C-alpha cells in the first residue's frame, strides 16, 4: 500500500475543483491511502468520500500561520511515512511542506500554475487570448506524473448516496414547477453582476409562476440584501445564513438550474451535477477555472478586447465603467436561464 499526501490549502472554489479528481484517483487505487491537507472549514466539502481518503486540517490563521508553523506541521506529517506528495497548490506554504519531505527523500509533484500564460491572458490590449489548460486537467496531470493513472469516474457527491428528502422538504417545501438557484455574489467586485441589474433579473424570473427562486449567499451584508429581495417578491426564498454547507449542497442538487457568478457556488453545483448558467466579467473561462463537467456554452460574457483583465477579479477596471458586466442585459440572462430550463423565451 502506498500513501499519498495531497495539498490544497485554499480557496474554497479551488478546493472544490480538486474533489472530482481526488475521488476518481482514490477509487482507481483502492489499495492506496490518500490524505488531503486543507483548511479545517473546507474539510466539510469532502462528503461521501472514498474510504481510502482521509482529511487533515491546517490552520493557516492560527498555529500554521507562520512559515515555522508550517515547517513544524510538515515535520509531524513525515512520521506518517508518505510515499509521495502531490502539491495541488504550489504556493509558499505548500512548497515549504514539500521541501521538508524532499529532504527526507520523498518525491514531490507540483501543479503547473501557468503564471506566465495567465499574465499574457490578462494583459492590456492589444492581445490575442487563447484558452489555458483547465485547472482540473492540470490537477489530473500532477497525479499522472506521480504514477497514479485513473479515469474520471466522479459524477456527483450524491451519485451513490441519496439525499435526505426530509431535509429538502424542510428547507424548501414541496417542489412545484422549476427550482432555480441564484448566487449573485462573489469574493471580488470584478466578478459581481451589478446589484440593480441582478434585482431586475430576480424581478423577471419571479414573475413567472412556474419558477421558484432560491437565493444563496453569505451572512452579514449579503444576507441582508437577499432577505430584502426575497421579502418583496413572490416565490423567492433567501437561504443565506440559515443552513450548513452540506444542507445547501443537498438543496443545490435538487435545483433545475443554478445562476451564478464566477464563484465557489458555481463549483458547488458542479459537485452535485446541477446545470449552471454563469455570468463572467473581469475574469474569463479561458483562464481554466470553469467548473468540472459543465458546458462553457452556458457562460454569459461580453466580447471586449480588455477581457480578461484579471485571473481572480481582484483588479480595478482599466476603463472605469465595468462594461464587461454592465453591458450584459438582465433580459439576456433571463432568456438563457429559461432556454436552459426548456421553457418559452420571455
Language-model segments: what does each one mean?
Residues 1-346:
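Catalytic machinery of carbohydrate-active enzymes
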